[in-house]
Amino acid sequence: MSRVAKAPVTLPNGVSVTLNDRQVEVKGKNGNMSLRLHELVELKQEDDAIIFSPTVDSKEAMMHTGTMRSLLNNLVIGVNEGFEKRLQLIGVGYRAQAAGNKVTLNVGYSHPVEYTLPEGVSAETPTQTEIVLKSNDKQQLGQAAADIRGFRPPEPYKGKGIRYSDEHVIRKEAKKK
């Protein structure tokens, strides 16, 4: 069986999980989230731990078991603590502003770029060159961060662009005569 699937998901205090006809609902202090359980995976709850197991003994079932365990673990963390991603804008005149559900970026184009955040994702700008995205949904948060980064990905020669705060950009040397 998948090594990931062997580890049970532990439920912290204040988080409850209910299973209704292959639909798993997770409730916590940051809201509710749900997940559709794959037909090759079954789960059982023991005290404050959830154990996953495949319904049939096949490689595909084991793969789905590990995936479902990771997805449910992300839901539990999301409704309990939430997720955060930080983006940095590096370049002369590059700046960002967050207002409501929109992020306005000035990243070297002739016009400011406006990005509408998906529902459930919030943004704040502690400085003009930093964006902090927060959400309960890890997948939605990562997609929003990737969309914003896609407006001006970091380039390898000067390093200008929008990058994740923990991203390392490999620099290239300019062509020599």
UniProtKB/Swiss-Prot annotation:
GO cellular component: cytosolic large ribosomal subunit
Any single GO BP term: cytoplasmic translation
Basic and acidic residues bias (residue ranges): 149-162
Keywords: Ribonucleoprotein, Ribosomal protein, RNA-binding, rRNA-binding
A molecular function GO annotation: rRNA binding
Entry similarity comment: Belongs to the universal ribosomal protein uL6 family.
Quaternary data: Part of the 50S ribosomal subunit.
The protein, known as: Large ribosomal subunit protein uL6
Protein encoded by which gene: rplF
